[in-house]
Amino acid sequence: MKNISDCFVLNNGVKIPCVGYGTWRTPDGIDTVKAVREALDCGYRHIDTAQLYGNEESVGKGIRESGLNRSELFVTTKLKNTDQGYDSTLRAFEGSMKRLGLDYLDLYLIHWPVPAVFKDEWKQVSRDTWRAFERLYEEGLVRSIGLSNFLPHHIDNIEVSA
């Protein structure tokens, strides 16, 4: 990597900036709005957030205040564990989009593999969640989909129905 604008190419051809600005542990509020705006002013083009972080609204506001065109940015957010499952994933996505104030996402990730609330049903819940992700991708609401913090056996489970 030579500079902050260098990119990797994902399996589906979408380019993702090599360097991203993460917003974990940045609380919702004016400080996060400012931090995101300043990161974008410094040249960052990939902004990473998550439902679990509780700051999607401020991240979205920082993006809007930057004055950059949406097409210049790469925005990632992640699904919260307790929102896994087909219908709840679709609802959670709508909520994230509303909080972020965006029309589409560049990358949507399942944040963690095993929702503890589902215990023995985790395999089916994970597959249903992935099916909802595929729908969002097919509808053009998400440019790429993926997994975060998954172990091989979690991935194998999803591959069965992907």
Model segments located where?
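N-terminal binding-site loop/beta-alpha segment at the start of enzyme catalytic domains
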Residues: 1-73
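Structural preference for beta-strand elements that scaffold enzyme active sites
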Residues: 16-20, 46, 72-78, 104-109, ...
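Active-site mouth loops of central-metabolism enzymes
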Residues: 17-30, 78-87, 117-122
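Active-site beta-loop-alpha junctions enriched in small/polar residues
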Residues: 24-26, 50-52, 78-82, 110-113, ...
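Glycine/proline-rich, positively charged
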Residues: 27, 89-162
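Short alpha-helical scaffold segments that flank and stabilize functional sites
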Residues: 35-38, 42, 65, 80, ...
